[in-house]
């Protein structure tokens, strides 16, 4: 009879599962390295890599305390079980090792607590590497679950707790010890106080609950600006009588008996004679005028033929408060502006004469042959060009200057361009062709200065040169002729060193 083989404990089984997990990772990394080297160059010698692999396997077995015999037995557990059943031998009962807490963590008063399992106590000085390709540690620590802080106060610690061992599995996960209280079914009381509601609604007005009548309110006339118009809608509106100013003939009215004499003075222009003035009559406005209203000169002869101004007004009452005399010899004529066709004077005939005289004076003031067509387009006066000369200039020319600012060329105006010789050092000077002679450019001729022809005609030059120690200026210079532009470019090429 074969000797009885004791079954492995739970700790040995967990170590075996962990060893298998690490071996699967090691084999995957090993094959990855071998394939990489083989793909790079297939004539590599893999003896060093194989030796490192064997050292890793031996190190893993030493860490998890697994011998070769135990590993071989764990690979075929079912065959051993079948053989034992067929032989009729009794198998010893399986032993379960007690879970021992090795990290020394204090007890937590909460109902449920999860602790990470500790690694085996075996320590190794160093772990071989695949040439800094991968590192295999003793145990991959399980990630700790991040628990949020409880919002309510924890319940009182339970007196009786149950302990359960969880973890492991075929991939060798971390073990955990879970403690459960016997009072899990009871609901924990919360100590958080909910603040009282402080929302305050606005109070209703006094007449909020009072029902308003649908009948329209009677308008009150007291204190109103238009109080005198109150209750006018009840009275029928009457058409007002016309008693104003009119420019037509008066409608026909029953004729009255002609009056013998008119006591109201006539409306005349000029200074009347004392003998012709009638006695003053009472005015409509309550005041007795001492003199009649006069707008011009009047004569005694023009009593019947001259038409009266404002003769179309009513004879009963005048606009100015005087009653007109009865029409005896001449018919009433409407109000007219200008000279009268009957030869009599009009109220506005003097104004027409003044306007005609003003037109004649204006025509006489204009010279002969003058008119609006003779006025040409306004031409601004031209700025006088001053050609300033430089005593030490080797080349001078009158040019039009444009400066490149932003994204376009801006015209500066007409100026004088000089190439000056100062003790063997040449410089380009451009001044405005004015009395002040504003300096637009003063740059030393060096290798940074470039003069380039920019058109087919050859009279435009683009000059690029340093205007200061940190800035470059670009000028467009237009010469009078292409020959002048060529002389300038040749001179720049000669002296720009």
From Swiss-Prot:
Region of interest called RanBD1, as start-end residue ranges on this chain: 390-497
Gene3D superfamilies per UniProt: Pleckstrin-homology domain (PH domain)/Phosphotyrosine-binding domain (PTB)
A GO cellular component annotation in the UniProt record: nuclear membrane
Region Disordered: start-end pairs: 76-95, 210-308, 359-379
Keywords: Membrane, mRNA transport, Nuclear pore complex, Nucleus, Protein transport, Translocation, Transport
An example Gene Ontology biological process: protein import into nucleus
InterPro entries per the UniProt record, alphabetical: PH-like_dom_sf (IPR011993)
Keyword Protein transport: yes
Bias (Basic and acidic residues): 231-240, 250-260
Compartments in which it is found: Nucleus, Nuclear pore complex; Nucleus membrane
Membrane topology: Peripheral membrane protein
Its biological purpose: Component of the nuclear pore complex. Plays a direct role in nuclear protein import. Required for anoxia-induced prophase arrest; may function in concert with cdk-1 to arrest prophase blastomeres in response to anoxia.
UniProt subunit comment: Interacts with importin beta imb-1. Interacts with DNA-directed RNA polymerase III subunit rpc-1. Interacts with TATA-box-binding protein tbp-1. Interacts with GTF3C5 homolog tftc-5. Interacts with GTF3C3 homolog tftc-3.
Protein name: Nuclear pore complex protein npp-16
Origin organism lineage: Eukaryota, Metazoa, Ecdysozoa, Nematoda, Chromadorea
């Amino acid at each position: 009879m074969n000797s009885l083989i004791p079954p492995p404990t739970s700790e040995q089984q967990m170590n075996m599962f962990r060893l298998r997990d690490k071996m699967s990772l090691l084999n995957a990394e090993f094959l990855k390295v071998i394939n990489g080297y083989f793909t790079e160059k297939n004539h590599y010698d893999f003896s060093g890599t194989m030796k490192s692999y064997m050292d890793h396997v031996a190190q893993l077995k030493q860490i998890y305390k697994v011998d070769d015999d135990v590993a071989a037995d764990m690979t075929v557990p079912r065959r051993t079980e079948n053989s034992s059943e067929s032989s009729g031998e009794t198998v010893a009962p399986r032993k379960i090792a007690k879970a021992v807490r090795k990290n020394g963590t204090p007890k937590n008063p909460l109902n449920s607590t999860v602790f990470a399992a500790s690694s085996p106590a075996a320590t190794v000085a160093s772990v071989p590497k695949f040439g800094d390709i991968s590192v295999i540690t003793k145990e991959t620590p399980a990630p700790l679950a991040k628990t949020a802080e409880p919002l309510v106060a924890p319940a009182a610690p339970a007196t009786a707790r149950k302990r359960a061992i969880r973890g492991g599995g075929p991939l060798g996960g971390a073990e955990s010890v879970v403690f459960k209280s016997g009072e899990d079914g009871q609901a924990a009381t919360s100590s958080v106080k909910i603040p009282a509601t402080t929302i305050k609604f606005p109070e209703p007005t006094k007449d909020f609950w009072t029902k308003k009548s649908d009948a329209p309110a009677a308008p009150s006339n007291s204190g109103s600006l238009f109080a005198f118009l109150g209750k006018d809608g009840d009275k029928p509106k009457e058409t007002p009588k016309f008693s104003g100013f009119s420019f037509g003939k008066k409608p026909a009215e029953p004729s009255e008996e002609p009056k013998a004499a008119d006591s109201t003075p006539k409306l005349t222009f000029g200074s009347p004679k004392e003998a012709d003035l009638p006695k003053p009559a009472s005015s409509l406005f309550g005041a007795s005028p001492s003199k009649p209203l006069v707008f011009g000169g009047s004569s005694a002869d023009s009593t019947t033929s001259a038409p009266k101004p404002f003769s179309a007004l009513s004879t009963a009452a005048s606009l100015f408060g005087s009653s007109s005399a009865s029409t005896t010899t001449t018919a009433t004529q409407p109000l007219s502006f200008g000279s009268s066709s009957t030869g009599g004077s009009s109220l506005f005939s003097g104004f027409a004469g003044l306007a005609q005289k003003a037109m004649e004076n204006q025509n006489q003031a204009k010279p002969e042959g003058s008119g609006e067509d003779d006025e040409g387009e306004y031409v601004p006066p031209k700025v006088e060009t001053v050609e300033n000369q430089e005593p030490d200039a080797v080349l001078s020319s009158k040019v039009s200057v444009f400066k490149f600012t932003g994204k376009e060329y801006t015209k500066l105006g007409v100026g004088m361009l000089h190439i000056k010789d100062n003790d063997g050092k040449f410089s380009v000077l451009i001044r405005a062709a004015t009395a002040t002679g504003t300096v637009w450019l003063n740059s030393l001729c060096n290798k940074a200065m470039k003069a380039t022809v920019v058109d087919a005609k050859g009279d435009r030059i683009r000059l690029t040169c340093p205007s200061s120690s940190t800035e470059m200026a670009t000028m467009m210079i237009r010469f009078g002729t292409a020959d002048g532009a060529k002389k300038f470019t040749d001179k720049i090429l000669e002296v720009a060193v």
